[in-house]
């Protein structure tokens, strides 16, 4: 009698559902996955090593390029670690701006996730809806930093600059008539804060639209319910964090459990799943978008009433003002020294973690008293999530592997780093 053997299948690295450069070696029995072996390192750029030869401030742009969908939250973890070692206080207004932009970034990430995840499973429309809203948030990034993605907006000691008074306007072109242009610029007539406020006022309706398309959709439920179930105990053992952990029913959120910046003053809830399957993780992330709206609204309200500095007054860390630099020789020398040599950080080590849209993003920083890190270790949430893929995919079909990769919300910039 013929012997029945399992066969091996390569999934990726150029598969559209592999989310970048994932190579999965699947061992299949018919169409059922017996083993899933992720091969990583195809996007390795030696970020941790490069940081050792750059001054502390020069490594901020590297952080944007780790998880390139949640740019500012990566920077946040890095600057928090530096601030811990320096022992400096960040002005209150800068803390509120950081929290506001963390939540904007969370929404940006979850919009990308819901669009891509639905597209992988076969729902095309959601992708188009989600990117409509991402466009507005990208414009907010551009307004404060000049870049749509890699912002490098956070600085050790605060943020690069205060929120501008004017929002960039759409310019006239051949493809837009006057009426369409006026409608597009309607919300852009005020300040950046007005634009963000307007966005978060209309955004709940947009989230309702995504839910209309997906939550009770029969096909969506058939593809997600009961797939990739992780028990609360296993979720903890495998080092899952963020929505992956909360989807399994554990209410662990660093914004509540280990508050940083002004999160302890924010009023919001932590959404938690029940069954620990892909559908619960979907519901958790959708509810997280709604909670981000609440947090952002509270920040906007405070920022309107409380003007103030957005950078520490510690001159070892903060650059001089532009006016001072162009009128005063000492300020010019100070500016030159700060951006060529950088500041020296006292000897020691620090770990700072933030509640990243994907989980716990941590930076472990070791300083030997020089102007560069002695060692920088990045704790990427996606790394632990990808490690759990084998266990989650076992016994499921090939098509379900796509769903599981989608629910893990994997980005390879941070995994391979």
Swiss-Prot record:
EC class of the enzyme, as a word: translocase
GO molecular function: NAD binding; NADH:ubiquinone reductase (non-electrogenic) activity; quinone binding
Topology term for the membrane: Peripheral membrane protein
Chief site of localization: membrane
One Pfam family named in its UniProt record: Complex1_49kDa
Keyword Translocase: yes
Assigned GO CC terms: plasma membrane
Catalysis performed (reactions): a quinone + NADH + 5 H(+)(in) = a quinol + NAD(+) + 4 H(+)(out)
InterPro entries per UniProt: NADH_Q_OxRdtase_suD (IPR001135), NADH_UbQ_OxRdtase_49kDa_CS (IPR014029), NDH1_su_D/H (IPR022885), NiFe-Hase_large (IPR029014)
Compartments (UniProt record): Cell inner membrane
Keywords: Cell inner membrane, Cell membrane, Membrane, NAD, Quinone, Translocase, Transport, Ubiquinone
UniProt-listed Enzyme Commission number(s): 7.1.1.-
Function in brief: NDH-1 shuttles electrons from NADH, via FMN and iron-sulfur (Fe-S) centers, to quinones in the respiratory chain. The immediate electron acceptor for the enzyme in this species is believed to be ubiquinone. Couples the redox reaction to proton translocation (for every two electrons transferred, four hydrogen ions are translocated across the cytoplasmic membrane), and thus conserves the redox energy in a proton gradient.
Assembly mode: NDH-1 is composed of 14 different subunits. Subunits NuoB, C, D, E, F, and G constitute the peripheral sector of the complex.
Family per record: Belongs to the complex I 49 kDa subunit family.
Entry protein name: NADH-quinone oxidoreductase subunit D
Source organism per UniProt: Burkholderia orbicola (strain MC0-3)
Gene that specifies this protein: nuoD
């Amino acid at each position: 009698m013929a012997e029945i053997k399992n066969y091996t299948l390569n999934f990726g690295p150029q598969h559209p559902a592999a989310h970048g450069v994932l190579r999965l070696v699947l061992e299949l029995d018919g169409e059922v996955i017996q083993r899933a072996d992720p091969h990583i390192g195809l996007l390795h750029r030696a970020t941790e090593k490069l940081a050792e030869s750059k001054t502390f401030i020069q490594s901020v742009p590297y952080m944007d390029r780790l998880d390139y969908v949640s740019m500012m939250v990566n920077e946040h973890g890095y600057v928090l670690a530096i601030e811990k070692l320096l022992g400096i206080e960040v002005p209150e207004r800068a803390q509120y701006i950081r929290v506001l932009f963390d939540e904007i970034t969370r929404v940006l990430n979850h919009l990308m996730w819901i669009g891509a995840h639905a597209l992988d499973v076969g729902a095309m429309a959601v992708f188009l809806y989600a990117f409509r809203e991402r466009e507005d948030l990208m414009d907010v990034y551009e307004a404060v930093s000049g870049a749509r993605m890699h912002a490098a907006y956070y600085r050790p000691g605060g943020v690069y600059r205060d929120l501008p008074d004017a929002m960039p306007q759409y310019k006239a072109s051949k493809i837009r008539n006057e009426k369409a242009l006026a409608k597009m610029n309607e919300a852009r007539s005020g300040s950046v804060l007005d634009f963000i406020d307007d966005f978060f006022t209309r955004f709940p309706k947009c989230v309702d639209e995504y839910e209309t398309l997906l939550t009770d959709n029969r096909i969506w439920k058939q593809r997600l319910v009961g797939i990739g179930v992780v028990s609360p105990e296993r979720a903890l053992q495998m080092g899952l964090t963020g929505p992956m952990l909360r989807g399994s029913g554990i209410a662990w959120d660093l914004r509540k459990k280990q508050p940083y910046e002004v999160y302890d003053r924010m009023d919001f809830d932590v959404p938690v799943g029940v069954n620990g399957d892909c559908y619960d993780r979907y519901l958790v992330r959708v509810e997280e978008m709604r909670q981000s709206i609440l947090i952002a609204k509270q920040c906007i309200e405070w920022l309107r009433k409380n003007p103030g500095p957005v950078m520490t007054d510690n001159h070892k860390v903060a650059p001089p003002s532009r006016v001072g630099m162009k009128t005063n020789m000492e300020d010019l020398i100070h500016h030159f020294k700060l951006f060529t040599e950088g500041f020296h950080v006292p000897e020691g080590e620090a770990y700072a973690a933030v509640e990243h849209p994907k989980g716990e993003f941590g930076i472990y920083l070791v300083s030997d008293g020089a102007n560069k890190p002695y060692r920088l270790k990045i704790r990427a949430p996606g790394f632990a999530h990808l490690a759990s893929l084998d266990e989650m995919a076992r016994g499921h079909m090939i098509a379900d592997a796509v769903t599981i990769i989608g629910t893990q919300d994997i980005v390879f910039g941070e995994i391979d780093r």
